Amino acid sequence: MPVVVDKFLTVTEHDNDKDTGIEVRNGDWIDISASGRIWAGVWFTSENGPNGWTGWAAGEDKPLPGAPPFSLIGKMADGEYFYIGAGLRRTYQNATLGPGATRLYLTVNDDKHGNGTGAFTVRIQVWR
């Protein structure tokens, strides 16, 4: 399988569903890795990496309840949010997509984007 995408981008604490510009198809192999630090805007807390507040589970007010708050998460235009953290490798499968493509979006698992600082540097590779 050849690499069809190898892209670096920045996801800030302010970004809400940042469009990566990447189209993903059924059967694509996706590798996402992230580094960097954000401060979520919660007083008396420190910065965190893309894994978010490990040991905590986000409440229903966050985009991905149950995942670590303030972690890096993603979604496809046709689906639900999924946890990425510092890295994710998987084959994309969607039974209803057929031969078409869907767009990849990234964000922080935060209900109040814009009240903190910092960013994650993300590398996305897609093999087809």
Which positions does each model-derived feature cover?
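Gly-Asp-aromatic-enriched flexible segments
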Residues: 1-128
